[in-house]
Amino acid sequence: MSEFSQNGIVSTLHDFGTKSTKEIEKELLKFSNERKMELILPCLYSELEGKALPNIVSEIKKTNYLDHIIIGLDKANEDQARKAWTFFEQLETPFTILWNDGPNLKKLDKELKKKGLSPNEKGKGRNVWYCIGMSIARNTARSVALHDCDIKTYDRRMLAKLFYPVVNPLFNFEFCKGCLLYPSPSPRDS
């Protein structure tokens, strides 16, 4: 059996070279009318000062099919949370920042701890857990994608390929995992 055979409801990112990024994004925009897409970005404040996240935000700004973005912000004081808000305002997609070290999430975490529902340890898992909770509470997304904020080789094709298998109504996938990193943009996208 070939390595790209897909059985079941889980897909892995593949690049068969059949569609350009623009073609995939055009279809995603069409699908977005009926199938809202939301992106989760769990990040540390320190990543705002690195090289990867500014590029990721720049690439996301080139997309037009996302309905909403949830940013989970960790390890940020109040001043840094304000700076993060200013940083992410450049996105042209509506967004929500969950400031994990802020008073509102600390209060929520305390309430959930009393009921045995809060993640035990701080970190990316907890960050993602709260972001998924926000997505569920918003109840508008048909598909949710999540990726790290330290991908140095990020380009918008990665995001398109994360959503495409689960948003395309001709496919029966419920989950898509990414495992391919592209050191440079695809020649088809030039």
Question: What residue spans do the PLM features occupy?
Answer:
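N-proximal low-complexity "stem/linker" segments adjacent to membrane-targeting elements
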Residues: 1-58
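Short loop->beta transition adjacent to catalytic acidic/histidine clusters or analogous donor-positioning motifs
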Residues: 36-37, 61-71, 94-95
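Short acidic, S/G/P-rich loop/turn micro-motifs used as interaction or catalytic elements
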Residues: 44-49, 76-78, 151-154
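A conserved acidic beta->alpha catalytic loop
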Residues: 73-84, 93, 102-104
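Active-site-proximal specificity loops/subdomain of glycosyltransferases
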Residues: 89-138
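Short beta-strand-to-loop acidic/aromatic patch adjacent to the donor-nucleotide binding site
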Residues: 141-150
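Conserved donor-nucleotide/metal-binding helix-loop-beta segment in metal-dependent transferases, i.e.
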Residues: 156-176
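Conserved small/polar residues in nucleotide/adenosyl-binding loops
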Residues: 182-189
